[in-house]
């Protein structure tokens, strides 16, 4: 098994940590965001998935979202995983292949043969926008409120804690829990504007997402036969 120690990374003066895939936590009740009806959220959940694999001999759990190119998730969710699956809202498992992997932006793209899921549109995030995060850390996809406090450039290491890269991102007001990495941030129009990747160590309810501006790093670099998904992370 390929392994690599992951390190705690910093965003400006705020301490962050990768959202661990180990264990489960209680989740807040689903609450529709302003401008998004309960009916719309039900439709959106058909495009959201739990992502599961085995990494460093431990179960890795994250979230993913269907877009035109495939299922988007975080690179740190699938790094070094074997037997990767996505689980839909009905609890059905589907074998997934990693067709793009970028540890610098913390993005990965998955392909599932024969899977039909409505592909959500992609839009740019706007400061102050209200929306939801579609997350699956509890083992089942659900929606939680997620408001965009700031749209920021993040100076951050790659998923292995190496180097320093500038990543387009956003600061969120959202109650993110372990396993929610890769959860899509959805705006009031029903578009994907980012993917959750971390939460603050210092401030409750503060989380961070990769902006949709970075998605092209994986949606335009697809290898249909699959790609090397790096070494697994010891969380």
Task: Locate predicted features.
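Conserved active-site neighborhood of the chymotrypsin/trypsin-like protease fold
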Residues: 57-58, 68-143, 226-230
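A conserved glycine-rich beta-strand in the N-terminal activation segment of trypsin-fold
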Residues: 32-38, 48-74, 92-95, 144-145, ...
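C-terminal cap/linker of serine protease catalytic domains
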Residues: 24-41, 118, 139-141, 193-235
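Flexible, gly/ser-rich surface segments that form the specificity/activation loops bordering the active-site cleft
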Residues: 118-168, 176-180, 196-207
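Bacterial N-terminal signal peptides that target proteins for export
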Residues: 1-10
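Conserved positions in beta-strands of structured domains
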Residues: 65-67, 97-99, 149, 177
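C-terminal motif of bacterial Sec signal peptides marking the signal peptidase cleavage site
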Residues: 18-21
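Catalytic nucleophile loop of clan PA
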Residues: 65, 175-196
């Amino acid at each position: 098994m390929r392994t690599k120690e992951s390190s705690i990374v910093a965003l400006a003066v705020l301490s962050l940590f990768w959202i661990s895939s180990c264990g489960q936590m209680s989740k807040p009740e689903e609450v529709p965001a302003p401008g998004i009806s309960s009916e719309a959220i039900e439709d959106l959940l058909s495009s959201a998935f739990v992502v599961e694999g085995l990494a460093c001999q431990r179960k890795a759990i994250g979230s993913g979202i269907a877009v035109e190119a495939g299922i988007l998730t975080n690179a740190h969710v699938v790094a070094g995983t074997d037997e990767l699956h996505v689980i839909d809202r009905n609890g059905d498992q589907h074998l997934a292949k990693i067709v793009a992997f970028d540890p610098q932006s913390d993005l990965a793209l998955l392909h599932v043969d024969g899977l039909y899921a409505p592909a959500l549109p992609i839009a740019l995030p706007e400061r102050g926008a209200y929306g939801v995060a579609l997350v699956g850390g509890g083992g089942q996809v659900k929606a939680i409120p997620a408001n965009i406090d700031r749209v920021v450039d993040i100076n951050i290491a790659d998923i292995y804690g190496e180097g320093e890269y500038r990543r387009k991102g956003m600061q969120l007001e959202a109650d993110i829990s372990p396993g929610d990495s890769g959860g899509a941030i959805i705006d009031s129009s029903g578009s994907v504007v980012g993917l959750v990747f971390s939460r603050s160590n210092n401030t409750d309810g503060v989380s961070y997402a990769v902006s949709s501006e970075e998605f092209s790093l994986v949606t335009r670099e697809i290898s249909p036969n699959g790609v090397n998904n790096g070494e697994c992370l010891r969380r």
